[in-house]
Amino acid sequence: MSASTATTQGIPRHVAIIMDGYGRWAARRRRPRVIGHRAGARAVNLCIDFCLERGIAALTLFAFSSENWGRPADEVGALMKLFLNALDREVGELHRRGVRVRFIGERSRFDAGIIARMDAAERLTAGNSRLALSIAASYGGRQDIAAAARALAVEVAEGRLDPADIDENALSRHVALADLPPPDLFIRTGGDLRVSNFLLWQLAYTELWFTDTLWPDFDAALLQQALDDFAARERRFGLTGEQVATASTTDTIAS
C-alpha cells in the first residue's frame, strides 16, 4: 500500500478513537463517574459531525472494553442504562443523516433489551453510506484475533481451507471491520500512551495521536489538530522515504 492510496489529500479514510478520561473529568467536578459519561456524549456527536463534514468514510469508537465488565456493578449498570438511552435517542437521527451503525465485540454479554436495540440499529441503517460508524462494545483486540483464528480452524476442519493457505489476508477476512480500510489515524484522549487492547490487528500501520485532554472536553479544534498532524506525517508502510516518494509520484501521474 502506498501513502497516496491511504488517504485523500491528507484526510484519513478511517479514524479510530479511544474515548478516555470520563471518570477524571467527573472527579475534578466532584461528580459521579456516570456524569462524565453523559458529558462525553457531546464529544461523540461532535466527532460524527466532523467526519460527515470532512468526508471521512469511517469512524470507530471504543465505548466499552471486554475488561470493563470487571468494574463495580453500579458503574456497569449505569453505563448500560446510558447505552440503552443513547440507542433510543440517537439512532433515528444517525439514520436520517446517512450514517451506517455497527457494533463489534461480544454482543451476547449484553442483556436482551440492549441486544435487540443494537440489532435494530444495524438493520435500520444498513443501507447508509455517508459514514460507517462502528462502536466497539464489550470488545477486546486479543479476543478479536482469537475469534478469527477459531473461524480459520473451522474452515480447515471442514476441508474448505488448506492450512498452507493461511496468511495475513486469510486472518484479516475474519477480524472485526474486515470490510473497511484499516484505521489511518488512531486518537486517544486522557493522557495515557497505550492502545489498551483496541484493534490490535487493525492498527498495525496506523498513525497514533495522543492528547491529555479528557474526552468530555474534546472538541473540533483538537480533532482538526490531529488531522493536521496526520497530514504532515510520511506513512512508509515499511518502505524507505525515497520509495514512498517514487510511488506517490507514479500514482499522481497515473491519475
Which residues does each predicted region cover?
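Flexible, compositionally biased loop and terminal segments
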Residues: 1-255
